[in-house]
């Protein structure tokens, strides 16, 4: 691929560059930019925490999007799609001895993933950059995945002594 004045171009077997008609600029899906660009209604979900980590608010956002009833597009324009669950939340609960809260947090994440999988409406994820840990589990629960060429997917919880628990 090569970026020129009006977008990305790709090279076929010949030396000529052809416009990439399948290019989707991630920023074009933002509700603030062209909210009616597409011919069908959809709900745009974007994680906006540091490194797009997942926390209870992220789970609530996904559940709210499902309740709206439109197809769901989970997309983030940045270096990370999602670096997974915010382990600082889990660490804080562990240091305080709040084991029940850790269990509730994990169950909430598991329920959210299952609701995503079986909600009956299309859930589309478009990961780019890192989609690791819980972020990868969100991608796995989607009905459709449109991955960027630079995406890095994986379950990396074992590197910090945990097991994947989202779904």
Predicted regions and their residues:
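NAD(P)-dependent Rossmann-like dehydrogenase/reductase catalytic/cofactor-binding core
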Residues: 1-39
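Short charge-dense sequence patches
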Residues: 11-21, 62-65, 143-150
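Phosphate-binding glycine-rich loops and adjacent basic patches that engage nucleotide phosphates
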Residues: 23-32, 70-78, 99-103, 157-161
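A structural preference for short, pocket-lining loop segments at secondary-structure junctions
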Residues: 40-46, 59-100, 107-126, 148-152
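Rossmann-like NAD(P)-binding element
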Residues: 49
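Conserved catalytic cores of soluble enzyme domains
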Residues: 102, 110, 114-167
